[in-house]
Structure formats: C-alpha cells, structure tokens
C-alpha cells in the first residue's frame, strides 16, 4: 500500500496538471493533500484523482471561504469520516477517516492555516 501526503501550496493553482502527473508517477493508493481548497483548480485536481482511481474522497473545507486552505483525502477504498471526541476548534485544519482497505485502518491528516486574529 502506498500513502502520499503532499502540501500542494495554495490549492495547486496552475500546477494542478503537474501535481496530478506526479501523483500518477507515484501510483498511490491513498493521497492526503493539505492546502487543498474549494476553488476550481483544487476541484479539478479532485476530479483528476477520481478519474485515476482515487474516487473515494473526504474533504475538510470551508464552503463560505472558497480560498481558505483545507484538506482532501482521496482513496482507492471507501472512506468513512470519524468524529473525534475532542475535536479541534478549526475543522478545516484536520481530517480523520477510516479507510476500508484490505487491512482497514484510520488516517489522520492535519494542515490548513491558523486563524489570524
């Protein structure tokens, strides 16, 4: 099993095709992307991952702020969101999922950006 974690920097922007090509070269079974966003480039990347077999996806995004950094986990196997008992106060900065792989496991991803006050 190959798991890749990658900070794609600012939602990927114009680099999403290069990011998708590099992920193709690595041939991961699961990808955890930080600084993923609800913007068109990031959404295009999610679609590209789905077309490459990473169709099971869970994201931690702020729909009210499309350009806010969040997280995406994409997998070849079904994902189940896990609700933590003591969740961080910033939900776009973490994502916890169960992976229904041949040997099931839990994956936690952290990323995003801190709230500025």
Identify what each model region corresponds to.
Residues 1-3, 69:
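Sequence-level motif detector for i,i+2 pairs with an aromatic at +2
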Residues 14-17:
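Signature of WW domains and closely related Tyr/Trp-rich beta-sheet microdomains
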Residues 35-116:
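Structured beta-strand-rich core segments of catalytic domains in phosphoester-bond hydrolases
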Residues 3-8, 19-42, 97, 109, ...:
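Active-site beta-strand/loop signature of hydrolases that rely on acidic residues for catalysis
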Residues 6-12, 85-86:
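Short, flexible loop segments at the rims of nucleotide/cofactor-binding pockets, characterized by
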């Amino acid at each position: 099993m190959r798991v890749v974690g990658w900070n794609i920097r600012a939602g990927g922007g114009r680099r999403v095709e290069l990011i998708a090509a590099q992920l193709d070269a690595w041939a991961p079974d699961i990808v955890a992307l930080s600084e993923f966003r609800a913007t068109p480039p990031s959404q295009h990347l999610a679609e590209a991952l789905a077309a490459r077999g990473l169709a099971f996806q869970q994201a931690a995004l702020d729909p009210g702020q499309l350009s806010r950094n969040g997280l995406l986990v994409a997998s070849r196997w079904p994902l189940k969101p896990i609700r933590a008992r003591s969740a961080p106060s910033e939900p776009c900065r973490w994502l916890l999922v169960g992976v229904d792989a041949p040997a099931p496991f839990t994956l936690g991803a952290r990323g995003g950006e801190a709230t500025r006050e």
